Amino acid sequence: MGLNATSQDWQNHISLYFPDVRLKSYVEIRNHDAQNTLMTLSIPAFWKGIMYNSDAMDEINKILSNYEYEDFMNLRKDSPIQGIQSKLKHIVIIDLIKEFFDISYYSLRENKKSEEKYLEPVYEYIALKRVPADNLIEEFNRKIS
């Protein structure tokens, strides 16, 4: 009556799974798919500010070295429920996000290419302690009420 799955179907299926980290010869960052137009350049600019500046990388490393593996696993467990109000040990994650964006901002500004402007849409969300999903949730709730 129906179709039976083949081993090739299974191979296709598992090729669509994107874990947080995959072993490759390069760094693949997949945490920001499908952002709105204003945010599209914010995330690559953020990563450029961090990854292309050894002082920025050292600063991030210094901050993150204060945490243990278990702290990150707790954050991973809590963040789908609590979002940016989740805590990494005792710090609310939105405060850590702001600190990271500040590091990236100053790094980009040092380059004198005016690329720090691409971080502005994220700073607007940070100031409001919101994320783009909050807008979608509000719109959805308006439509169903």
Question: PLM ranges: what are they?
Answer:
Residues 1-145:
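C-terminal accessory/tail domains of diverse enzymes
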